[in-house]
Amino acid sequence: MSAVFAAALTACGGGGGSPGDTSESYTISLRAERTSLPLNVGHYPVGIGVEYPYTTTLYVNAKKGSAPIPGGEDIFACNTEYGLSSGPLYYLDGKDEHQKEGVPLAYRSVTLGSNSGGNSFHFHASDQAGTAKITCSVHDPRANRQVSTSINITVGGATGMAGSIK
């Protein structure tokens, strides 16, 4: 009887170990430290920290089920879908290709690698009131489709008054 039980247990794959490849789809999330920024009528520079109130950090993450997606280069694509006049995107990663003479370059879209399923980038308010919609996507290789999510960042909404209207 124990031989039959052992054979049945072996046949069904019992005994633990890896669950193997799962068929779970990718999910993506995008959040910002602040979704409302003041108008930058003084044209203050972009930066990270409390000394830079016109800049917010955005965090993009993707999971396959409950686990982070695999790492790699050029995994996330993030774009200013609309509202570019309210502010551009920045890497602020210190890489030479993302700055000119030590000054960070502004972008309408960024491409990011994945480390532990996520990465971060930045949005910097301009002197134009409005809402910027930022969309990020990741390719789900199992489903062979793009998975995306968006977030809105309001510039100039904190006071209710626009400092500059065109």
Which residue stretches match the model-derived regions?
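Bacterial Sec-dependent N-terminal signal peptides
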Residues: 6-34, 159
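Short, solvent-exposed loop/linker segments at the N-terminal edge
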Residues: 37-54
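Short, solvent-exposed loop/turn segments enriched in Ser/Thr/Gly
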Residues: 50-58, 117, 128-134
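Short flexible loop/turn segments that cap and initiate beta-strands
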Residues: 54-55, 61-106
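Surface-exposed loop/turn motifs at beta-strand-loop junctions within extracellular Ig-like
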Residues: 64, 127, 138-142
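Extracellular/luminal low-complexity segments enriched in Ser/Thr/Pro
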Residues: 99, 106-129
